[in-house]
C-alpha cells in the first residue's frame, strides 16, 4: 500500500500509473460537522493500492485519471469526492446494485465479502476517528482492505452479470443512483412528517415544529455541526407540543411567528388503484423469485405507486432501458 499525503507524491502516482479502472472507498466524519467531512480516500487498481489524505493533498488534479469507478453503495463516496474537486467519470458502477441484481439477500460490503469470498472483515475500526493524524496501523490496514476486497468482489459479480445478460442493467441502475444522489447536495430542513412523535398532532403543533426545524437547520449550518447536536428530534417534538420553552430569543421569535401547517395531503386511493398496486406487487414478487433478483431491482416501489395513480409505465424513466427490454410484455399484462 502507498500512503500519499504530499502533493508531489500524488503527481508521481498520476504519471507512473495509468489504470483503466479504479476501486474507490472513502472514510468521512458525519458526527461532528454540518456536512460530512472527507477524511480518507482509498483507491485500488489492477496491480496496486493507495490511500490518499484529502486533508493534505488537492484531489482536483485527479480529474480525468483512472477510468471507470467501482464503489459499494457509492453515492456518498462519489458526492464527497466531487465536493473535494475530484469529479466522478461518466462510468461509475456500484457493487451493491450488482448484488441486488444477482439476488443476494445481504447487501453490506462485509456481508458480501464473507458470503462471496469467504473472508471475514474485522469492523473494529469502522467507527474510529478518521480525521485524527497520524492514523494507527490498524486504521491503515482496515482502509486498505475494503478496496482490495471490493476489487475481488467485482470480478465475481461481473462474470455472474455477464452470464445473466445484466451488464447493461448494472450500468443503467448505477447511473440512476448517481443522478439521484446529486440531489443530496441540495440540503433542506428535515420535514416534520419524519418525526414519529408528531404524527397525531394538530396543525398548530406541526406549524411550530416546522419553524423549529428551520431554525435548527440554520443554526447547524452557521455553527458547522450536525442538526441533532443543536436539538434532537425528541426535543423538537416536545417544544412543538409546548412541553418545553425555548431559551434562545431567535427561536422564540420563530415560534411566535409560526402559523398552523396541515399534514401534506396524499391522494385518496381509488379502488382501481388499490387493485393495481396489489397486482403489481404480486407480479414483482413472482419475477424476483424466478430470476432471482431483489424486489427493488425488478420494480421500485415508487414506480408501483405512480403506475397505480394512473401514470403510464412507459413514461417513467426508471422503467426504460433494460427493464423495458426484459419485462415489457409481462408488465403490460400485469397492468391490464
Predicted regions and their residues:
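A short, charged helix-loop
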Residues: 111-138
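Short, surface-exposed recognition loops or helix-turn segments adjacent to catalytic cores
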Residues: 93, 124-132, 162-174
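Active-site-adjacent beta-strand anchor residues
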Residues: 71, 143, 229
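C-terminal folded domains that constitute the principal catalytic or ligand-binding module
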Residues: 139-145
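Conserved RNase H-like, two-metal-ion catalytic cores of nucleic-acid enzymes
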Residues: 1-115
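Accessory DNA-binding and partner-docking regions appended to nucleic-acid-acting proteins
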Residues: 137, 157-336
Amino acid at each position: 500500500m502507498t500512503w500519499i499525503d504530499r502533493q508531489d507524491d500524488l503527481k508521481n502516482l498520476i504519471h507512473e500509473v495509468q489504470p483503466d479502472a479504479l476501486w474507490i472507498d472513502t472514510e468521512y466524519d458525519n458526527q461532528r460537522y454540518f456536512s460530512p467531512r472527507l477524511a480518507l480516500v482509498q483507491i485500488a487498481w489492477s496491480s496496486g493500492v493507495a490511500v490518499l489524505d484529502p486533508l493534505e493533498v488537492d484531489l482536483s488534479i485527479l480529474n480525468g485519471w483512472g477510468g471507470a469507478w467501482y464503489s459499494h453503495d457509492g453515492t456518498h463516496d462519489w458526492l464527497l469526492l466531487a465536493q473535494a474537486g475530484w469529479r466522478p467519470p461518466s462510468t461509475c458502477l456500484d457493487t451493491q446494485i450488482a448484488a441486488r441484481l444477482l439476488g443476494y439477500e445481504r447487501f453490506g460490503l462485509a456481508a458480501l465479502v464473507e458470503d462471496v469470498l469467504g473472508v471475514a472483515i474485522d469492523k473494529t475500526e469502522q467507527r474510529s476517528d478518521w480525521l485524527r493524524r497520524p492514523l494507527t496501523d490498524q486504521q491503515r490496514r482496515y482502509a486498505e482492505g475494503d478496496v482490495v476486497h471490493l476489487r475481488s468482489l467485482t470480478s465475481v459479480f461481473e462474470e455472474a452479470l455477464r452470464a445473466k445478460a445484466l451488464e447493461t442493467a448494472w450500468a443503467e441502475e448505477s447511473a440512476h443512483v448517481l443522478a439521484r444522489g446529486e440531489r443530496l447536495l441540495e440540503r433542506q430542513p428535515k420535514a416534520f412528517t419524519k418525526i414519529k412523535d408528531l404524527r397525531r398532532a394538530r396543525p398548530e403543533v406541526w406549524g411550530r415544529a416546522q419553524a423549529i426545524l428551520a431554525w435548527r437547520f440554520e443554526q447547524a449550518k452557521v455553527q458547522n455541526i450536525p442538526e441533532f447536536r443543536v436539538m434532537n428530534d425528541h426535543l423538537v417534538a416536545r417544544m412543538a407540543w409546548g412541553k418545553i420553552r425555548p431559551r434562545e430569543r431567535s427561536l422564540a421569535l420563530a415560534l411566535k411567528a409560526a402559523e398552523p401547517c396541515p399534514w401534506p395531503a396524499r391522494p385518496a386511493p381509488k379502488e382501481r388503484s388499490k387493485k393495481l398496486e396489489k397486482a403489481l406487487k404480486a407480479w414483482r414478487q413472482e419475477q424476483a423469485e424466478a430470476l432471482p433478483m431483489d424486489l427493488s431491482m425488478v420494480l421500485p416501489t415508487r414506480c408501483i405507486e405512480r403506475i397505480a395513480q394512473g401514470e403510464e409505465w412507459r413514461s417513467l424513466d426508471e422503467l426504460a432501458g433494460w427493464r423495458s427490454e426484459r419485462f415489457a410484455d409481462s408488465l403490460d399484462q400485469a397492468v391490464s
